[in-house]
């Protein structure tokens, strides 16, 4: 019984984000496809998208060698976790690993020394 209830709650929990999406009536919205005009100049958004598509194969091939993040241009909006860590270090003034170890140290219980050295586990001599 508990397993069934927990499965239902888990299923509803996964469906919750789907229920929050707006639903559109298909009769209200008509499908509009626009053909690209070859004579029209490209906008900056289209140029940026084209440059990202050109960089993508290079990044995928470079990921095997591990040098893809070095080749990526800083003007592209590609997530770089090491760059974000450097920004965090500049902002906070300390290494994120040190901060994490301090946070975890507060959670741990302090080690208590035994009062009597004659006792081992729960057996005392």
UniProtKB/Swiss-Prot annotation:
Primary localization: secreted
PROSITE patterns found in the cross-reference section: UROTENSIN_II
Pfam family, one: Urotensin_II
Compartment(s) of residence: Secreted
Top-level lineage group: Eukaryota
Disulfide pattern: 119-124
Propeptide cleavage-removed residue intervals: 21-111
GO molecular function: hormone activity
Signal peptide (from-to): 1-20
InterPro entries according to UniProt: Urotensin_II (IPR001483)
GO annotation, cellular component aspect: extracellular space
Protein's GO biological process: blood vessel diameter maintenance; regulation of blood pressure
Keyword annotations of the record: Cleavage on pair of basic residues, Disulfide bond, Hormone, Secreted, Signal
Function according to Swiss-Prot or TrEMBL: Highly potent vasoconstrictor.
Similarity comment text for this entry: Belongs to the urotensin-2 family.
The protein, known as: Urotensin-2
Gene that encodes the chain: UTS2
